[in-house]
Amino acid sequence: FDFILIEGAGGIAVPIYEGTDDFYMTKDLINDCADCVISVLPSKLGAISDAIVHQDYVNQNVSASNFLIMNRYTDSYIEKDNQMTIGKLTNKTVYTFEEHATYENFSEAFLKQLIGVKNELHTTT
């Protein structure tokens, strides 16, 4: 990747700048320059609702593809159930990232998905 933008401003539906007539939102920045989005989800109670609302917003407003990853995953029964349920409801693979893990702990499957990701919107011919 030439550039990596890490969003930490409170979510994908957050205004970055208020113009005269409208807002420039995080989704606008993503649409302007992102090839893919890694959507970081909670793994605890409430994760299903957060994931469904987030993914619905992404599907309606973002042109880049996205990956779902549950953060601070401890492999508890609730987290396993959340992962399975979110996957079924979004029709997406839900990757996990363990609590206190480092970049070396990303799964091979997740890293393979990232390699070569290209958003057709930003590809010129």
What residue ranges belong to the model's regions?
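Switch II (G3) loop of P-loop NTPases
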Residues: 1-21
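Secondary-structure boundary/capping motif
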Residues: 14, 46-50, 78
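Inter-motif core of Ras-like GTPase G domains
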Residues: 19-43
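Conserved acidic residues
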Residues: 2-3, 34-35, 66
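Anionic group-transfer/hydrolysis microenvironments
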Residues: 9-10, 44, 73
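C-terminal lobe/tail of nucleotide-utilizing enzymes
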Residues: 52, 56-125
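Histidine-anchored nucleotide/phosphate-binding helix
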Residues: 23-30, 49-59
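Structural motif
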Residues: 5-7, 38-40, 69
